[in-house]
């Protein structure tokens, strides 16, 4: 858990296995990834509640489902989504709740989530690969495809060496763009 005071105040805490409600799933976390956003939360640069469980990206397995859950079965492989309350369209402030920021995150063995807070993992990806996709991969996709409207044959400048840049490089190349 994060504690006011930054990285040197992080704590490992033992807790009981969480209980779920009717519309929730219990996920055993297989892998999680650290993004720049997570670092900012841990450093206190992004204000959050004291004792927040960090990390917003993960992969895992559904190990229990609530009575009214219809989308998932025990054993399903899932990955996190950056903004679980934002389904489509332009983001609105009320949809921008971020797991690991305004809600407890994936730096845990088990997490309880609404059934709508996750999506299926891509086929052929390992749990570790999947855990890198939600924030960095989708940020790169949004920048290049949704906002940038990148087409084959166009040239794109990709700056940086972090997760978003690496995904942007791979996406641009796979789309037939020239990367500088």
Locate each region found by the language model.
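A short, glycine- and basic residue-enriched loop/turn
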Residues: 37-39, 147
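Extracellular beta-rich ligand/substrate-recognition surface
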Residues: 1-9
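Structured surface patches comprising rigid loops and adjacent beta-strands/short helices at the edges
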Residues: 112-120
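Glycine-rich beta-strand-centered segment in the early N-terminal region that forms part
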Residues: 16-32, 42-87, 102, 122-125
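Cysteine-cluster motifs in flexible loop/terminal segments that predominantly coordinate metals
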Residues: 84-109
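Mid-domain Rossmann-like dinucleotide-binding core that forms the NAD(H)/NADP(H) cofactor-binding site
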Residues: 78, 125-180
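Alpha-helix/helix-capping structural signal
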Residues: 32-34, 67, 116, 138
């Amino acid at each position: 858990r994060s504690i006011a005071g930054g990285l040197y105040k992080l704590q490992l805490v033992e807790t009981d296995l969480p209980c779920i409600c009717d519309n929730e799933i219990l996920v055993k976390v297989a892998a999680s990834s650290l993004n720049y956003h997570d670092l900012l939360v841990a450093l206190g640069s992004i204000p959050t509640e004291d004792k927040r469980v960090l990390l917003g990206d993960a992969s895992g397995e559904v190990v229990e489902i609530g009575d009214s859950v219809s989308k998932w079965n025990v054993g399903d492989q899932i990955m996190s989504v950056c903004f679980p309350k934002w389904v489509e369209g332009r983001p609105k402030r009320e949809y921008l709740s971020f797991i690991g920021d305004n809600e407890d995150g994936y730096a845990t063995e088990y997490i309880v989530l609404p059934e709508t807070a996750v999506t299926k993992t891509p086929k052929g990806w390992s749990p570790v690969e999947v855990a890198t996709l939600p924030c960095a991969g989708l940020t790169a996709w949004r920048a290049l495809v949704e906002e940038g409207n990148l087409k084959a044959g166009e040239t794109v400048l990709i700056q940086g060496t972090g997760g978003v840049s690496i995904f942007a490089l791979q996406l641009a190349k796979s789309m037939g763009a020239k990367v500088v």
